[in-house]
Amino acid sequence: MIRHFYIVFIMILLSCKKDSQTTEKAQQVDSLSNGTSKPIESPKQFEFTVTTEQDFIKAKAKFKDKLTQDTINFPKINGEIKLPIQGDKPTQLSFRDTLLNTDDENIREYKYEGQFKDIDHYVVSGTFWEHYEIYLINKKTGENTLLWNNPTLSPSNQFIANLSLPFGLEGTPIGIQIWRINKTKNTSNFSISKHLEINPIDWAPTDFVWKSDKIILLKVAKVDAFLNNNGIPHKNDYYYLKLSF
């Protein structure tokens, strides 16, 4: 009887220890990433690990941005940008500025940033009273995908990523968005769908670079570093994370 009680006691003790280790590990991972994903269709797996400034700089030097800044080809005329859409019935997509040089809250100004020729999408930015956003526009269909900030195409054209706006703007999200490039079978048509959105709790990203199609390196700082230094963290406040997904 005593032996039986002893065996049961040991099993319970080991079980508690295992649960404690699992909880501790989960807390460590949460402390590192402090992120939650908001996928569109189903949960996506992602992982944050610490990397170095040297790795970040090396990846920056190697990476080539694929945005073609052919802004001279689509000039703004009388406050309006017109972009040709190559559908079954060719048409134009128009972006018109309003109320420039005023203090009206309805002010808006658009800028043609360029295009990703590899996936047939224009990039247009919109600046508003207290807001900024990016439009990723399909050149063949005119379909518009709304992004937080300026996008960057991955090395093999599988994904697009963009950060949030700089920390400190009231009401704006903090984090990173990742978009999947979908190619229609037996055609040259591309579409964009959200793959992953990560909203960290206590840190904010300031820069990023693609290391591969499934790995992004981020330069980040704790939210407190922004709050305690008028929105500009000290150099030593920054650290680097590797996002694998």
Residue positions per predicted region:
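Sec-dependent signal peptide recognition
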Residues: 2-8
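Terminal domain-start segments
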Residues: 24-126
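Blade-terminus and WD-like Trp-Asp/Gly-His loop motifs, strongest in beta-propeller folds
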Residues: 114-118, 151-162, 208-215
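C-terminal motif of bacterial Sec signal peptides marking the signal peptidase cleavage site
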Residues: 14-15
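Surface-exposed loop/turn elements that mediate protein-protein interactions on large endomembrane-trafficking
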Residues: 81-103, 129-146, 177-195, 233-245
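Beta-strand C-termini and the immediately following turn/loop, strongest in propeller blades
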Residues: 124-129, 162-168, 173, 218-224
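Short, solvent-exposed loop/turn segments at conserved positions within beta-propeller repeat blades
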Residues: 74-76, 127-132, 169-174, 232-235
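Repeated scaffold domains used in trafficking and secretory/extracellular systems
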Residues: 105-112, 147-156, 199-208
